[in-house]
């Protein structure tokens, strides 16, 4: 399916690895010009940058000044904004172990980074009378988990923000949607210091056992791949989804078992 994204100008946050990198790779392959915001780059992202279609802007998007700095270097035209930056620290010590500093850091990264990046990018979209905003949310927005309590709260806030914004800017040609993955085969879950390893350290179970147990809760029996999330994001960014706004798309292998 040709998504007709060639020549579009896109901004992706958190694009150095995992889901974000897959989105950047997909947009570039479709012919879009992509500005990527990340705190640090990666070998894979640097390789994409050498193609000339991808520009990397190093910015701490959890810092209040980071999003405006990124958008300020993205050019005058922004057709697509993908708010992807985020993190889900596992809180194996329970609610009482989560400090004010933990809450603040999680909300800054998982909610306010998207709010601020959207605030910075939206004027250009409104001036053009067109634009697409897709934010990476999470199944934890509707399945709050005590092991990622602060993350669940932040993602619920992100879902509410995007739904409310879609009602405000939809009449002005801007579409706003969210994508909510379940466990994805990325470093956030499976890498050094990821969820599986953190839970392993707290419980004594091997990291692979933790990951296998999580996968068994999904109807498909496996984690979602980053490229599968990216494919969904690219579809929503395209004109094929021109009458879709204010919607949340779950991609979780059947983890959520309710309607």
Model-derived features with residue positions:
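Alpha-helical segment proximal to the catalytic Tyr-Lys
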Residues: 123, 167-168, 242
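Residue(s) in the substrate-gating loop at a strand-loop-helix junction
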Residues: 138
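Substrate-binding pocket helix/loop in short-chain dehydrogenase/reductase
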Residues: 91-95, 99-107, 199, 214
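Active-site helix of classical SDR
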Residues: 118, 154, 162
């Amino acid at each position: 399916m040709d998504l007709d994204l060639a020549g579009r100008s896109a901004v992706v946050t958190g694009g150095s690895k995992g889901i974000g990198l897959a989105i950047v790779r997909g947009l570039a392959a479709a012919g879009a010009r992509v500005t990527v915001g990340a705190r640090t780059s990666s070998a894979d992202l640097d390789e994409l940058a050498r193609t000339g279609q991808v520009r990397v802007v190093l910015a701490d998007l959890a810092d209040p000044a980071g999003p405006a700095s990124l958008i300020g270097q993205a050019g005058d035209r922004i057709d697509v904004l993908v708010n992807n930056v985020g993190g889900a620290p596992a809180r194996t010590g329970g609610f009482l172990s989560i400090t004010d500093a933990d809450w603040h850091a999680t909300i800054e990264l998982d909610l306010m980074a998207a709010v601020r990046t959207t605030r910075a990018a939206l004027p250009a979209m409104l001036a053009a009378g067109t634009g697409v905003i897709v934010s990476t949310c999470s199944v934890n927005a509707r399945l709050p988990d005590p092991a990622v309590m602060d993350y669940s709260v932040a993602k619920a806030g992100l879902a509410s923000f995007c739904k409310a914004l879609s009602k405000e800017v939809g009449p002005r040609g801007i579409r706003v949607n969210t994508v909510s993955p379940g466990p994805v085969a990325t470093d956030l879950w499976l890498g050094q210091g990821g969820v599986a390893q953190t839970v392993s350290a707290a419980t004594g179970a091997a990291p692979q056992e933790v990951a296998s147990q999580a996968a068994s809760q999904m109807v498909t029996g496996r984690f979602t791949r980053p490229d599968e999330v990216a494919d969904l994001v690219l579809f929503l960014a395209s004109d094929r989804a021109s009458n879709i706004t204010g919607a949340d798309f779950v991609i979780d292998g059947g983890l959520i078992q309710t309607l």
